[in-house]
């Protein structure tokens, strides 16, 4: 990376504190997983809200910090990570007897867990290799300014992605429970339903941002690096596609047979890296990196479908019919009116609100009438009516 010599000390502090934060987050995984496995989503939500509020507080503290803001920022993030770990650990220690540390030696269990963790580590390394490799390639061929543009796009992606991640987290225990009970029909239903619902919600959030990216970035940052708008749009497309991957990833974890999954997906990530290098070297266009990532994710989705068919017997044609067909209908029908408004109106605040309102109305209606089957619409209607009576008819 290109780091100014006078900022090398701060960069080293940031690097060390980032490693320490990563270690704390890894140690906290068994406790947060226990909370999710017991479906204590209220506690999970409280901890998440605390985490978000504290990170927001950091932003205000940075404005008045009398010392190096980068080191101060990294230090506070590390402190928040410690608090998150303590909250998870203390709650699990009080509520769940199995979270207590006891001396046990089960060779078969250790072998199984070791294999699971090792192959998961391979998959995670391949993802880090590709994602960080993109940063290095952008830095090498396009410079730090273009890398900053990617950083902005990733910030927006993380903010939007957190919403559907929480929804998927709430569904994951049921997918795993269905597999453990050998109830494959219910498992397929949950995979299909969560894929569609998370996709529709993500589409509802991302379409206005993709259309009005220039306006939003102008209000948020004023001046921003070149390529930021294109990076943001392509990154959000990848984010939408990830909603189709997450349920299948959870289903794979439920089987415990992660070797084939991580080997194939990891190989795809690694193979794409030299291809990306050749393309950026020949074209010099940074957008091609993100376009290749979109293509890779599409290939990865269908690769995962073949893995699901082999591992849990999920028919690919059923996924195409019950998920992909509905999604395609929602994508095109939900975007027509917002896109027309975007093209016909001037770039003003009025257009921004008009496009946002049109996206909410059109995508909601398209998702309800075209994106759900009859049973899902009935369940959704009953749920909305139930919430209405609880909130407004007390």
What is the role of each PLM region?
Residues 1-2, 61, 164, 188-243, ...:
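Alpha-helical transmembrane segments of multi-pass membrane transport and lipid-handling proteins
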């Amino acid at each position: 990376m290109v780091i100014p010599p006078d900022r090398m000390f701060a960069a080293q502090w940031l690097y060390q504190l980032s490693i320490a934060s990563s270690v704390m987050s890894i140690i906290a995984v068994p406790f947060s997983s226990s909370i999710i496995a017991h479906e204590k989503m209220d506690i999970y939500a409280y901890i998440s809200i605390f985490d978000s509020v504290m990170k927001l507080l950091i932003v205000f503290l940075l404005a008045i910090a009398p010392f190096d803001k980068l080191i101060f920022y990294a230090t506070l993030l590390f402190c928040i990570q410690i608090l998150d770990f303590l909250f998870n650990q203390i709650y699990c220690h009080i509520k769940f007897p199995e979270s207590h540390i006891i001396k046990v030696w089960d060779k078969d269990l250790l072998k199984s867990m070791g294999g699971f963790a090792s192959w998961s580590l391979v998959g995670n390394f391949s993802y880090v290799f590709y994602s960080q490799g993109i940063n290095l390639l952008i830095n090498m061929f396009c410079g730090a300014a273009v890398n900053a543009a990617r950083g902005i796009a990733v910030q927006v992606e993380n903010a939007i992605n957190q919403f559907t991640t929480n929804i998927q987290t709430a569904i994951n225990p049921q997918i795993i429970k269905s597999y453990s009970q050998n109830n494959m029909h219910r498992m397929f239903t949950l995979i299909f339903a969560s894929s569609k619902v998370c996709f529709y919600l993500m589409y509802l959030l991302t379409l206005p941002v993709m259309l009005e990216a220039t306006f939003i970035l102008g209000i948020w940052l004023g001046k921003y690096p070149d390529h930021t708008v294109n990076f943001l749009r392509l990154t959000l497309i990848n984010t939408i596609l990830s909603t189709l991957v997450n349920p299948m990833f959870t289903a794979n974890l439920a089987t415990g047979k992660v070797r084939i999954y991580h080997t194939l997906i990891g190989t795809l990530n690694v193979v794409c890296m030299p291809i990306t290098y050749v393309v950026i070297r020949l074209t010099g266009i940074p957008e091609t990196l993100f376009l290749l990532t979109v293509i890779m994710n599409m290939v990865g989705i269908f690769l995962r479908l073949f893995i699901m068919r082999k591992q849990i017997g999920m028919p690919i044609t059923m996924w195409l019919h019950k998920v992909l067909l509905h999604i395609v209908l929602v994508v095109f029908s939900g975007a027509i009116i917002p896109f027309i408004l975007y093209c016909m109106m001037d770039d003003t605040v009025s257009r921004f609100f008009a496009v946002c309102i049109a996206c909410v109305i059109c995508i909601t209606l398209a998702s309800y009438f075209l994106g759900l089957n009859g049973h899902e619409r009935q369940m959704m209607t009953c749920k909305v009516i139930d919430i209405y009576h609880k909130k407004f008819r007390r």
